[in-house]
Structures are given as C-alpha cells and as structure tokens.
Amino acid sequence: DARLLASLGAGLLLSFALPFVAFGLLRVMTNLNRLDAAAVAAHYGSISIVTFVAASSVLEGRMVDAEGYMVTVAAAMEAPAILSALWLVARVAPDDERMDATLLREILLNGSIVLLVGSFAIGTITGQDGLDDISSFIVAPFLGVLCLFLLDMGLVAGRGLRAVRGQLSFGTVAFAMLTPLVGSTLGLGFGLLIGLWAGGVALLMVLSASASYIAVPAAMRVALPEANPSIYLTLSLGVTFP
C-alpha cells in the first residue's frame, strides 16, 4: 500500500526532524544549557503512546475512521527521535569529543532501540496469534503497570519541581506549550499531503505533537546522566501531556 509506506516515511521523517526543531527553539526561548536542551528536545521528537491510545479512543467514540496501520506509524516513530537525541547529545558533549564510530555503534545498539525494533519485528512475525498466546501477561496488566510507571514519573517530577523552579522560566513553559502546536501543524501538513482519512490526519497530528515520558526518559538516564531529569520530566509530563 503506497499510502502505508508514505505514512511510515512521514512518521520517520517527523521523528528524526522534530528533536532538531525543539533543540533550536530551546536555545532561543530558554536559558537551559546545551546538555539539558538536548535531553528535553529528545522527548519532543518521540511520541506518547498513552496520548495516542486516548486519541484513538476519542475518535472511535465519535465514529471517526482512521487507518488501522497508524499504530504501526506510532511504533516506528519511537526510535528515530532517540537516535536524533543521541546524536545531539554527542554533538554537545564536553570538550567536543569526536566519537564517530563509537557513537554510531552506541546509537544503533542502544538498549531502547534494540527493544523497540526487536519487539516490532517479533510482533510482525508472530501476528495476532502470538499476541493472543501472551495477552494475559502483556495486555491485561498493561494499564496497571503503566499507572504505576506514571505515578513514579510524577513523583520524580514533583520532587524536582522546587529544585528547577528557577530554571522553569516563562520561556521554558512556553516552549512546552508551543512545540506541540508546531509538531501538530507539521503532522497536519504531512497527513493532508499523503491523503490520510480525517482520523488518520488527527492521529498523525497527535503523534507529532506529543512528548515521550516513557521510552526517552529511560534512554536519557543512560545516554545523558548529567542532564536534569526533573526538567525534561516536568515539561513533558507536567506541562505538555495535560
């Protein structure tokens, strides 16, 4: 299906490009240092699967049709943003260290990337029958585990809120509110260009507008431990997500 391939291509391109857009906005609008700006930018290129699920439920409730393969686009948009973020991290590393070969290996073999791509491949191979076999272990407890994870993320953001209050300037909060509008506008343009249904366009806008608070925080804690997690979690989870 040409439209499926075009949708995947658009999703990959948006996920690769949005961290660079976010990084540029952060450098102009905020006083964050380059390392924290790179870590924050990573979150705004990746996606929030919870927001995607919520948007899908809203569309279904309003009987607005969307392409079934948009969940595939969502899965494809997780990894590229992490790749872009890790590249940004390397470019802003202290002392301008050059780690081209090492960096490439680190990016391609990053644990989050391997798990995401590997899970996608396994799901493609096993299909619905494979999911049915393990649904009681994977599907049933998903929302409960996710709630616990979000509670933990909220605690982390809450504990760090006082510490980063001086850094969460008007510009920083404005960035967290403006960037989703930029992303959704780009998603709207690509969706209309591809010719997606109204629901598909809406979901691509949601994917482009959302900020990650699951996959990317875990990756940033490993790739950029010097960055302040309270900043990027507070912005993505406390400002953008609501």
Where are these regions (language model features)?
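Alpha-helical transmembrane segments of multi-pass small-molecule/ion transporters
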Residues: 2-153, 158, 165-168, 177-242
